[in-house]
Amino acid sequence: MERTFAMIKPDGVRRGLTPEILARIQKKGYRVVGLKQMLISRELAERHYAEHRERPFFGELVDFITSGPVVAIALEGENAIAGWRAMMGATNPANAAPGTIRADFATTTGENVTHGSDSPESAARELSLFFREDELLK
């Protein structure tokens, strides 16, 4: 079974989308093995988005992700990384397929409701940033 890191970003939490997104995850058959609502510190945000540090939008990205609570989720299931990314849809909601989370709920590329790891390496790194091993179900 593959594990991945998923996040409901501040815009999704603020708009009350957490129950709907969790329902979609469970309906798809993924197992939630870790879940916490939290505020992300600037330090954690900068570590999480380290690959974007040199990009012009880095500061705005860190400001946004620290602007309110997020829901950090550890998912487990067959092809969880690709499956969760397919459920989210394209980063730009205008390009997201109908029925995806971003097509249904995102307003802009910057405030696009969800995050998901893009590779096994990213999933392992991001899960370790947001969860201790003893916080995850076996």
Swiss-Prot record:
Tell me the cofactors it needs: Mg(2+)
Superkingdom as given in the UniProt entry:
Bacteria
Query: Single Gene Ontology BP term?
Result: GTP biosynthetic process
Q: Any idea of its EC number?
A: 2.7.4.6
Which GO terms of the molecular function aspect are on file? Answer: ATP binding; metal ion binding; nucleoside diphosphate kinase activity
InterPro entries the record matches: NDK-like_dom (IPR034907), NDK-like_dom_sf (IPR036850), Nucleoside_diP_kinase (IPR001564), Nucleoside_diP_kinase_AS (IPR023005)
**Where's it mainly located?**
cytoplasm
**Reaction catalyzed:** a 2'-deoxyribonucleoside 5'-diphosphate + ATP = a 2'-deoxyribonucleoside 5'-triphosphate + ADP; a ribonucleoside 5'-diphosphate + ATP = a ribonucleoside 5'-triphosphate + ADP
* Nucleotide-binding among keywords: yes
Q: Which PROSITE patterns match?
A: NDPK, NDPK_LIKE
- Pfam families xref list: NDK (PF00334)
What subcellular compartments does it reside in?
A: Cytoplasm
Which residues are recorded as binding ATP? 9, 57, 85, 91, 102, 112
According to its UniProt record, which residues of this chain constitute the active site?
Answer: 115 (pros-phosphohistidine intermediate)
Family membership noted in the UniProt record: Belongs to the NDK family.
Binding partners and assembly = Homotetramer.
The protein's role, per its UniProt record:
Major role in the synthesis of nucleoside triphosphates other than ATP. The ATP gamma phosphate is transferred to the NDP beta phosphate via a ping-pong mechanism, using a phosphorylated active-site intermediate.
Q: What is this protein called?
A: Nucleoside diphosphate kinase
**Species in which this protein is naturally found:** Deinococcus geothermalis (strain DSM 11300 / CIP 105573 / AG-3a)
Q: What is the lineage of its organism?
A: Bacteria, Thermotogati, Deinococcota, Deinococci, Deinococcales
